[in-house]
C-alpha cells in the first residue's frame, strides 16, 4: 500500500546493472558460534535467520525431546559462500598463484559449508544434506526432508536455505539478458526481467502430533 520496496539500485562490486535485494547489516554481522572458518556472507545470513522468531530456542527444545542424533539438517543453496572464493582469487599470491591462507574453502565456498555450519551452530548431530539445483534448491530440500521423516531416518529436520549476493550471480544473470533495468515487476504485463536478491530462512519440520504440547503451524 505504501509502495515501498526492498529493492535498491545495484551497488555491489561496481556493478550498476539492475536492482538488488540486499540484506542490511550482513556485512557487519559477526558469527559467534562455530569455527571462524565458517565466516562468510552466506553463513552470516543463515546465522541472522537462526536468531529470528525464536528459532534457535525451538531447535533446542526439539533436541531436548528427541536427542541431537535425531535432528537432521536438509538445506538448499545454489551459491553457498562463493563470494569468499571470488575475493580470494582476486588476492592470489603473484609468485605462487595461491589464494590467501585466510581463505577456508571447505567452510565457505563448499556447498556443504552451510549445512555443517547450521549443525554446529544449533547443536544437532543427525544426518546432513545439501541440495543444490539452482532456484529450486530449497523447495527440493523440503521434499527430501519429508522423505527422511517418513523413512524414520530422523524425528525432526531443520530445513530451508540460504543464498547470498555474489559477482557470479549478478554478472551471470546480466549476461543472459535477464535482469530488469528497474525493480522487477513479476506480475506486470510490461515486466522485463528479474531482480537478484539474497535471503535465508529455516523451519523445524516434525511429524504431526509427535509433540502434542507444541502447536502445529502448518
Regions found by a protein language model. Give the residues of each.
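Conserved active-site "lid/cap" helical segment
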Residues: 1-76, 81-84
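Active-site-proximal alpha-helical scaffold in enzymes
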Residues: 59, 111-115, 119-161, 195-212
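Active-site nucleophile and cofactor-binding loops and adjacent substrate-binding regions
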Residues: 12-14, 43-49, 104-112, 129-137, ...
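Glycine-rich beta-alpha junction loops
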Residues: 77-79, 162-166, 209
Amino acid at each position: 500500500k505504501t509502495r515501498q520496496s526492498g529493492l535498491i539500485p545495484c551497488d555491489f562490486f561496481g556493478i550498476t546493472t539492475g536492482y538488488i535485494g540486499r540484506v542490511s547489516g550482513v556485512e557487519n554481522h559477526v558469527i559467534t558460534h562455530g569455527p571462524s572458518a565458517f565466516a562468510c556472507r552466506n553463513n552470516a545470513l543463515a546465522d541472522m535467520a537462526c536468531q529470528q522468531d525464536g528459532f534457535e530456542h525451538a531447535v533446542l527444545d526439539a533436541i531436548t525431546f528427541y536427542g541431537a542424533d535425531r535432528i537432521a539438517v536438509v538445506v538448499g543453496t545454489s551459491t553457498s559462500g562463493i563470494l569468499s572464493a571470488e575475493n580470494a582469487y582476486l588476492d592470489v599470491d603473484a609468485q605462487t598463484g595461491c589464494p590467501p591462507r585466510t581463505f577456508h574453502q571447505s567452510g565457505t565456498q563448499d556447498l556443504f559449508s552451510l549445512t555443517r555450519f547450521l549443525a554446529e551452530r544449533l547443536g544437532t548431530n543427525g544426518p546432513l544434506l545439501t541440495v543444490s539445483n539452482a532456484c529450486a534448491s530449497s523447495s527440493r530440500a523440503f521434499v527430501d526432508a519429508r522423505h527422511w521423516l517418513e523413512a524414520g531416518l530422523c524425528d525432526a529436520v531443520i530445513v530451508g536455505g540460504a543464498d547470498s549476493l555474489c559477482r557470479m550471480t549478478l554478472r551471470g544473470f546480466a549476461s543472459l539478458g535477464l535482469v530488469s533495468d528497474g525493480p522487477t515487476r513479476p506480475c506486470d504485463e510490461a515486466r522485463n526481467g528479474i531482480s537478484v536478491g539474497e535471503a535465508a530462512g529455516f523451519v523445524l519440520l516434525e511429524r504431526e502430533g509427535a509433540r502434542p504440547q507444541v502447536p502445529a503451524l502448518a
